[in-house]
């Protein structure tokens, strides 16, 4: 069974998401979560019935059914908590959308979700960032210029009272750098870490000792290890502030003779 997200995209139904949301609502009011599995199964059966009858299953359909099920089984405090959870999620979506709507093709929603998750405090709200960003963003600018404005907004919001904006600015700077790097690599026809090592060696920008002492399979394995430290919650890039990442990019990356970082 597939469900339809708010974006219109489809994804496989996963009952664990319902269970997690209800468990969070139960825990927030001090209720034991023992009934969650049974309630989730009941909701899943109703969704299957609706789907079999030819109905499309939207995210809102599921959330409405969760509320109805909690009310049916006399969980007033829990349903109130779930409603507040829905409202909170809606506000976060709205805050992200206000920013993403200012870009024509660059998709920042995933990055903004990560920021909301890692910086839940009120002083790091995306609404505040949007107000700062919109104060000097011009209409009709390119996505590249808009991203530069967003980085500038986050940097300018860094204060003694809210110092972690510098980490948020760093994330946007990394997005900008990745876009530029991808374009450079595509122009050079470089599609892998191994090919990058080969190119740098051939151009005299990197010692030949790596390609001489390690096979392609070994270098590919190194690339996987590096990539594992560059994604998810363990992303080491998240340890860098804006100023430290900016310094790293400007001074310590290997560059071509045309001063292009690779």
Model-derived segments and their meaning:
Residues 1-262:
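Extended catalytic cores of very large enzyme megasubunits
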